[in-house]
Amino acid sequence: MFRKGKKRHSSSSSQSSEISTKSKSVDSSLGGLSRSSTVASLDTDSTKSSGQSNNNSDTCAEFRIKYVGAIEKLKLSEGKGLEGPLDLINYIDVAQQDGKLPFVPPEEEFIMGVSKYGIKVSTSDQYDVLHRHALYLIIRMVCYDDGLGAGKSLLALKTTDASNEEYSLWVYQCNSLEQAQAICKVLSTAFDSVLTSEKP
């Protein structure tokens, strides 16, 4: 499938939300980047900046999602090549075609909780935790249509370990692109809240 990427640019439109900090910034942007559908991307290593703030402190938003799979412990050299949203999408596509990730997740639903502490994925009864992604270890989040025609969307997380030596990709399925975009938006707000609270 042919894909054409567009360079992201700073914009004052309602479709772009950017937050700057001393060392990192968050960029949550919506743009037609792939599969002729909307891709929402949250990039915590961006160099963009503007001064929005929102101080919703301890709230946790919950979403029902399915777990597709993960590619863990990518070496630094491999992870560095996965900088943009299209890089992640293409990498996941190839991994699915190679059988490293399934195209369709198992039927079991999980609860994804997003807060200023990060992301927690737990069983639907919330007794068992499947994954925890600390906020400061999340490098990028991308959501996009899965291309299978059922209206489902994939949500991909790129994370690093505490020593920044390895990267991992985590892939979840959302019921719709709107749900996936909502998760990106909540995570952006969580970053915003933490960054705002760090200011003197």
Curated annotation (Swiss-Prot):
Gene designation per UniProt: ITGB1BP1
Residue span of region Interaction with ITGB1: 139-141
Protein purpose: Key regulator of the integrin-mediated cell-matrix interaction signaling by binding to the ITGB1 cytoplasmic tail and preventing the activation of integrin alpha-5/beta-1 (heterodimer of ITGA5 and ITGB1) by talin or FERMT1. Plays a role in cell proliferation, differentiation, spreading, adhesion and migration in the context of mineralization and bone development and angiogenesis. Stimulates cellular proliferation in a fibronectin-dependent manner.
Effect of residue 86 to Q: No effect on ITGB1 binding
Segments of this protein annotated with the region Interaction with KRIT1: 136-139
GO molecular function, one term: GDP-dissociation inhibitor activity
GO terms (BP aspect): activation of protein kinase B activity; biomineral tissue development; blood vessel diameter maintenance; blood vessel endothelial cell proliferation involved in sprouting angiogenesis; cell differentiation; cell migration; cell-matrix adhesion; cellular response to fibroblast growth factor stimulus
Domain PID: 58-200
Subunit structure: Interacts (via N-terminus and PTB domain) with ROCK1. Found in a complex, at least composed of ITGB1BP1, KRIT1 and RAP1A. Interacts (via C-terminal region) with ITGB1 (via C-terminal cytoplasmic tail); the interaction prevents talin TLN1 binding to ITGB1 and KRIT1 and ITGB1 compete for the same binding site. Interacts with KRIT1 (via N-terminal NPXY motif); the interaction induces the opening conformation of KRIT1 and KRIT1 and ITGB1 compete for the same binding site. Isoform 2 does not interact with ITGB1.
Protein modification: Phosphorylation at Thr-38 seems to enhance integrin alpha5beta1-mediated cell adhesion. The degree of phosphorylation is regulated by integrin-dependent cell-matrix interaction.
Name of this chain's protein: Integrin beta-1-binding protein 1
Organism lineage: Eukaryota, Metazoa, Chordata, Craniata, Vertebrata
